[in-house]
Swiss-Prot record:
It comes from Corynebacterium diphtheriae (strain ATCC 700971 / NCTC 13129 / Biotype gravis). The gene is lpqB. The lineage of its organism: Bacteria, Bacillati, Actinomycetota, Actinomycetes, Mycobacteriales. This is Lipoprotein LpqB. Belongs to the LpqB lipoprotein family. Coiled coil: none annotated. Pfam families: Germane, Gmad1. InterPro entries: GerMN (IPR019606), Lipoprotein_LpqB (IPR023959), Lipoprotein_LpqB_C (IPR018910).
Amino acid sequence: MRNHVSRYLTALIAVGCAATTAACTSLPSNSEPQALRSFEASASEEPQGPVEDQEPDLLLRDFYEANNNPQQRYSLARRYLTHRASQSWNPAPETLVLDGIEINSAADSSTKNRRYDVRGLIVGSIGEGGEYRPRNERYSTTIGLEKVDGQWRISTLPDQIVVQRNELWNHYRQKQVYFFDTSGTTLVADRRWIFQEKMGHNDNHESALLSLILTGPSKSLAPGVVNEVPSGAAYAGYHDDYYQFTGLSSLDEDSLKRLTAQSVWTLALAEVPGPYRFKFDGATMKSPINGSEDLTVDDFAEYNPLPQQAVDSGLYAFNSNGVKKLNQGVATPTTGTLGNTHNIESMAVSAKTGATAAVRTAVEGDAKTSTLMLGPIGGQFVDVLKARRLTSPSFELSSSSLWVVKDSDQVVRLSRSSENEGIVETVVDTSELGSLGKNISALQLSRSGVRAAFIVDGSVYTATVARPNPGQRKLVNVQEIIPSLANVAQSLAWQPNGSLIIGTSKPDAPVWIVAQDGSLGSKLSAGNIVAPVMNVAASQSTLYISDARAALELPNSDTSTTYWREVQGLEGSRSVLVVPR
């Protein structure tokens, strides 16, 4: 019954997440990990326990290698401990991710007892359910070893799992679990780190994903999404061709439909073969379209979390000569207000409706002023907001509202009034930003509108968009997404796959791609780029930047290319590219 039928699975693999047939488990967890996906056994050079007569420093390094395997409460790692240490060791649920592990012998070591100072830079941590959080702090501890029957074993150690970043990528995979935003209309990706197990069972992949849905969203995302699953709900396994759940009797019909849609899209985008059948407390879920028990993403197409490019949404560019539309290397000036405006500083276009927002600048006396105007491409625009400085506007998914930062310290949301067709301005609550809210130079909403990325004093942060009350918005769970780029970030944009493209002032690393959760930051080729990179944009196929001299592009499929190509139709001019989104 599980025929893999979906036209939606041809795009959007997350940064650094290659397709794999490995089995996986979500980590860390206080319970026994669940296997994700069968794996064909192969020879492994990884240590399976202490090597006889191994030197203590080498044994300690192998112990940290064994930290990557959480099965049976880290039973492999416990083999490196003395019996007493193994009995008392109780690792915390949080796993620390270090850039590297430095091991040095302590001064008070002896022939029978050794002590080692272990240091490193903490770049992130993985919490329960596999949520990654970026960090930037030093790690330091001391490990004691003693001889047991002539063999070195670890006798004293902290209750903490520590892994190296490169080993994280070798032993874990990233999977997306989907939850609805607070409106109940948009699915939002929740990225989790999953342990890649070397042995598994046929249905473990689905089991882990569906269990994560029932467990609920990650802590950082939770304020921006809804979790309608009651606390007593459980996944009962795959039996008689059905995924079976219990404890859902309190949910109404609409809630059950949303849970089914979550499950279908999570399984489908994890490449679990469909169609899918579900039983909730013994009741069979059926297609809302044709009543079939065999469900696919087509039955819930209205919740498709993948970006849908509108017909003729196009590609635009602007410079001192106004706005142009690009088509197959030809730049054609637009008509209306934009075609005649020569002082545009930033611009955004909704791929869904074609609604357009642009910021134009002017010098009045000794002061610069910025004006936000709204209208359709090719039509007449109206002024809606004026300030000393305005960041590039960013539309919400519906395009009926947009965000902009006013004078670097006030985030405002502009919405069309349902009563009089006017524009309503509300201030976004940024109280959790503290001092970070005083000098915001860029802010962009993710496609779903549940996340915001912004730049403060050259550092990049993300936050979750909460809705405390109707019409209100608040930025919560603020975190610096990539501390290594502190003080150099100039521009940012969300890619269709949920990662960020960031332009910087660093000549040797002017453009970066950063994973949604900050777990990976990859610098792209500096090639022929002249920093700083003041504008960035991304379509499903191409990355665009504007450096100090020109508009350049690079295929998304080949980011290893050394040189960026000047955008055809814009040669010889410094232009800014605008991708409708």
